[in-house]
Amino acid sequence: MDKARKLEIIKQYGRSEGDTGSPEVQIALLTERINSLTGHLKVHKKDHHSRRGLLMMVGHRRGLLNYLADQDIERYRTIIKQLGLRR
């Protein structure tokens, strides 16, 4: 993910200009990295080091989603729908 794509995601999901800490932005950035790494692992099936990193990112995203669901269920439902995550 290049810098321009990262700024685009922050602008799209951020609550204000330059908002990088909100759960929505963190979840969206993690989702982008997860999708990228998933494509990498389809080509490089034996890359177990990257697979472990992928599983850690998925776990981190799950924790952020759980936090958001506890804090504000509407924001949670919105981000799930926007990113196309199933739950």
From Swiss-Prot:
Gene it is expressed from: rpsO
GO terms classed as biological process: translation
Q: Which domain of life is it from?
A: Bacteria
Give coiled-coil spans as residue ranges.
Answer: none
Q: Could you identify this protein by its name?
A: Small ribosomal subunit protein uS15
Q: Mind telling me which NCBIfam families this protein's record contains?
A: S15_bact (TIGR00952)
Q: Which family does it belong to?
A: Belongs to the universal ribosomal protein uS15 family.
One cellular-component annotation, GO: cytosolic small ribosomal subunit
Q: Report the SS bond pairs.
A: none
Q: What role does it play? A: One of the primary rRNA binding proteins, it binds directly to 16S rRNA where it helps nucleate assembly of the platform of the 30S subunit by binding and bridging several RNA helices of the 16S rRNA. Forms an intersubunit bridge (bridge B4) with the 23S rRNA of the 50S subunit in the ribosome.
Subunit comment for this entry? Part of the 30S ribosomal subunit. Forms a bridge to the 50S subunit in the 70S ribosome, contacting the 23S rRNA.
The record ties this protein, via CDD domains, to: Ribosomal_S15p_S13e
One of the entry's Gene Ontology molecular-function terms is: structural constituent of ribosome
Q: Which InterPro entries match?
A: Ribosomal_uS15, Ribosomal_uS15_bac-type, uS15_NS1_RNA-bd_sf
Keywords, comma-separated and alphabetical:
Ribonucleoprotein, Ribosomal protein, RNA-binding, rRNA-binding
